[in-house]
Amino acid sequence: MSQLNFTYPITATFRMITLSPEVQVKNSSDELLMQVKQKLLTLREATTVYADLEKTVPLYHIKADRISGFRAVHRITKAQGGEAVGSVKATGLRSLWKTHYDVTDAQDRPLFYIQEENPWIKFLDALLDDIPLIGPIAATFIQPSYLLKDASGTAHYRIVKRRSFVARHFSLEHLGTTADFPAELVALSLIQTIFLERNRGGA
């Protein structure tokens, strides 16, 4: 993964018209970083991250440790060899209203967390979705956002959701700090956040 060019902002595009949920991740130069596909009809969420558009070169697997729920831990491993990379977990009852995902490293040590900036924005975004015709149009001007923070509460990245009629676009912006988080884990936690928020009605 180290050979990939993680230049920011990174854009993740969630296609709305595919049968199985897919996310395409590109860097600021529009180079493909990851093609992501989530399996349908499984009790435990399972996602494969590929290096190519044709999905022939798997890079990572993301699997829930139990039947989907807010206590599930989504473990990230390398496709070759099964080496642990990290995990993403929604933190209990707090996540029912305001998104909060804890991200750990390969040794299960807390590394950073992802938190919704303003839950009312996402509430308005979901509300507009239910209004015929004008709702989806108005919702294109609503941009829910999330902050990636360290244990001290310092924000290092921002995830911003932008929508169109055929896709959801998530932009991962670096806020100019000097935190040395693994770029692969930051990108993979972005992907898992998109899928988890989709299940909660926020993506």
What are these language model-derived features?
Residues 1-203:
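Intrinsically disordered, low-complexity proline/glycine-rich segments
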